[in-house]
Amino acid sequence: MPSPAPIEKHPFEPFLPEGARILFLGSFPPQPFRWCMPFYYPNWINDFWRIMGIIHFADKDHFCIPAEKRFDEALIRAFCTAEGLAFYDTACEVRRLHGNASDAFLEVVKATDVPALLSRIPQCDTLVTTGQKATEVIAATFGCPVPPVGEYIDLAMPARGTVMSSGSSVGPSASTISPSACTVMPGPDRASLHFWRMPSTSRAYPLALEKKAEAYRKLFTPSTNCAQKPIISSMLQSSG
């Protein structure tokens, strides 16, 4: 029987600054009444932007306007553009089975075509998931193992001009996802892609803010992000 919950479409456009090197993918934004700004990680009690403040400015409140309990969207957009940080989510249509923001009760109706997203930022070499649901969707899309929290695996990517298709079901809490349209990867050959699984920035995730920042700091440490790891061939099927 179909779920009675309404289908929600993603409220934001992908944020893909020119020259982006890191793509952050969450699951899906919370309901609008939880936002303090119309941008990614908009919930005032989500710590993503505090983590970025700690890592880059040694100040958890760098992107915060505490008196107004909101984040500084203009400052965040400028920072992400300068640093080459891209954002979207692994689902573009969902149902909230319990009417809340919990990943555990989020039914993925339509997954994001991640290869198509990557084709728009050809210099991106690092993909980061920020929660369990997002990690499951990416592992299913690329047919790869799930990395441990705070670690990454390298995915061998098809060469320039390869035609790819993606899509699969993502476990018992997700509906079957129809394969996406085939996508051509333009630009320079993307030999491999670092796939990082990071701890959730939600306060519900049982890890101290400082420990989360320690994990996320690895993304911005060249010796860590460029270390040699076994390369796992992507199972995206070529149709050309």
Regions picked out by a protein language model, each given a short descriptive name:
Residues 15, 77-80, 119-120:
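Short, conserved, surface-exposed binding loops centered on an aromatic residue
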Residues 23-25, 85-89, 196:
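Short hydrophobic-aromatic micro-motifs
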Residues 33-106:
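Short, surface-exposed acidic-centric catalytic microdomains
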Residues 22-33:
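Catalytic nucleophile-elbow at a beta strand-turn-alpha helix junction centered on a G-D-S/GDSL motif
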